[in-house]
């Protein structure tokens, strides 16, 4: 198995790339797609995500250098797979965990206007909160009206964002429970 220079043991470098994932939807799309479908080649990322080839190579290299992607084959074309992300931030008593599911939700801002508009209105913290309700909605433990009340948004906006995030919540739901 091929080994690459990674960011393991360099938490601040990994923090920087996680910040980049949060701020760069295309980078988040590459990570999220590789996490769900990996191992993948750069060519597959280009074809399946419609990302320009130069961008795909650059972003794969950035993720690999930070230790979030690993080259898993020595043969050409190289295949890459992900390392799990789990970064918990606590600010002023509010805790948020950056997980593969949240990265996948952020990635949707690049391809889903409803998610993009929601982030414009409520920010990434609002998206993280809405994603938690999307998980509960997939588990059928919450309605859009309850989510609307608790997120302090209209029932229509709650329904729209929960529907937009449902594929992410369904893909990352714990099948055991």
Language model region names:
Residues 1-177:
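Haloarchaeal acidic low-complexity proteome signature biased toward cell-envelope/secretome components but also
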């Amino acid at each position: 198995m091929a080994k690459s220079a990674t960011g393991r043991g360099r938490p601040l470098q990994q923090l920087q790339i996680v910040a980049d994932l949060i701020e760069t939807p295309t980078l988040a799309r590459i990570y999220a797609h590789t996490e769900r479908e990996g191992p993948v080649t750069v060519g597959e990322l280009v074809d399946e995500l419609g990302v320009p080839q130069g961008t795909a190579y650059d972003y794969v290299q950035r993720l690999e250098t930070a230790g979030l992607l690993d080259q898993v084959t020595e043969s050409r074309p190289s295949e890459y797979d992900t390392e799990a992300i789990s970064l918990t931030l606590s600010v002023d008593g509010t805790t948020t965990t950056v997980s593969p599911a949240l990265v996948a939700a952020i990635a949707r801002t690049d391809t889903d206007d409803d998610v993009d508009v929601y982030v414009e209105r409520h920010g990434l913290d609002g998206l993280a909160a809405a994603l938690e309700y999307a998980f509960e909605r997939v588990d059928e433990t919450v309605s859009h009206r309850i989510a609307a009340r608790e997120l302090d948004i209209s029932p229509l906006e709650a329904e729209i964002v929960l529907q937009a995030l449902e594929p992410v919540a369904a893909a990352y739901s714990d099948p055991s429970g």
